[in-house]
């Protein structure tokens, strides 16, 4: 596995300064979620969100997602932080947004949730295993049912779909194209190219 992260060198009045590519993009208020969602990743993303809020609470944050999902509680930590901070968070799906990845994608600011055309989106109900005494298994079963209800309500809030539709779709793995995700309400737009930036000098 190649873990090499490219470096970017910039000229400053104090000489050259180098950044890894993700740190340089963070300066532009761009955050990446790539791979599994787990506690360490969630802590890093939450910290970046909070840092960017402290830098400028009124400027949007761009959150790029390419994730197969992961630990539900870790994903909910990111979700809650996205809702908590003052800047609007725009989400962009690149590659895939599955399971908790799809929940974080749809949790972006309404009207600012995007996907590239060949991305894959998947939603499903949470899964888990339990072992031990019968009472312990019963407790775990109640907890995962409560968690399923919580996640369903989050999807209802952000997609505008009624609860019975969400419950039916979430019953099994449901894969969608970017266009299908837009029709369902998970995203707002499928984008092929970044919009052209107006030339300030022309005004």
UniProtKB/Swiss-Prot annotation:
EC number: 3.4.21.92
Location in or out of the cell: Cytoplasm
Keyword Calcium appears in the UniProt entry: no
Keyword set includes RNA-binding: no
Reaction equation(s) it catalyzes: Hydrolysis of proteins to small peptides in the presence of ATP and magnesium. alpha-casein is the usual test substrate. In the absence of ATP, only oligopeptides shorter than five residues are hydrolyzed (such as succinyl-Leu-Tyr-|-NHMec, and Leu-Tyr-Leu-|-Tyr-Trp, in which cleavage of the -Tyr-|-Leu- and -Tyr-|-Trp bonds also occurs)
Residues of the active site: 99 (nucleophile), 124
UniProt-listed PROSITE patterns: CLP_PROTEASE_HIS, CLP_PROTEASE_SER
GO CC terms, sorted: cytoplasm; endopeptidase Clp complex
An example Gene Ontology molecular-function term: ATP-dependent peptidase activity
Keyword terms, alphabetized: Cytoplasm, Hydrolase, Protease, Serine protease
GO biological process, any: protein quality control for misfolded or incompletely synthesized proteins
Family listed: Belongs to the peptidase S14 family.
Function, as annotated: Cleaves peptides in various proteins in a process that requires ATP hydrolysis. Has a chymotrypsin-like activity. Plays a major role in the degradation of misfolded proteins.
Subunit structure: Fourteen ClpP subunits assemble into 2 heptameric rings which stack back to back to give a disk-like structure with a central cavity, resembling the structure of eukaryotic proteasomes.
Protein name: ATP-dependent Clp protease proteolytic subunit
Name of encoding gene: clpP
């Amino acid at each position: 596995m190649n873990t090499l992260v490219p470096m970017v060198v910039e000229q400053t009045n104090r000489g050259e300064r180098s950044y890894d590519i993700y740190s340089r993009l963070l300066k532009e208020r761009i955050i990446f979620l790539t791979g599994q969602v787990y506690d360490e990743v969630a802590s890093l993303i939450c910290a970046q969100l909070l840092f960017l809020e402290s830098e400028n609470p009124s400027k949007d944050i761009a959150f790029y997602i390419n994730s197969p999902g992961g630990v539900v509680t870790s994903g909910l930590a990111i979700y809650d932080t996205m809702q908590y901070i003052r800047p609007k968070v725009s989400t962009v799906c690149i590659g895939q947004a599955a399971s908790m990845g799809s929940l974080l994608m749809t949790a972006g600011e309404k009207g600012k949730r995007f996907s590239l055309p060949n991305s894959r989106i998947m939603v499903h109900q949470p899964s888990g295993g339990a072992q031990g005494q019968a009472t312990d298994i019963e407790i775990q079963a109640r907890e995962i049912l409560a968690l399923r209800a919580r996640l369903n309500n989050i999807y209802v809030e952000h997609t505008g779909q009624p609860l019975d539709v969400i419950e039916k779709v979430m019953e099994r793995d449901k894969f969608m194209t970017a266009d299908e995700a837009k029709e369902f309400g998970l995203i707002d737009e499928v984008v092929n190219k970044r919009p052209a930036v107006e030339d300030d000098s022309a005004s």
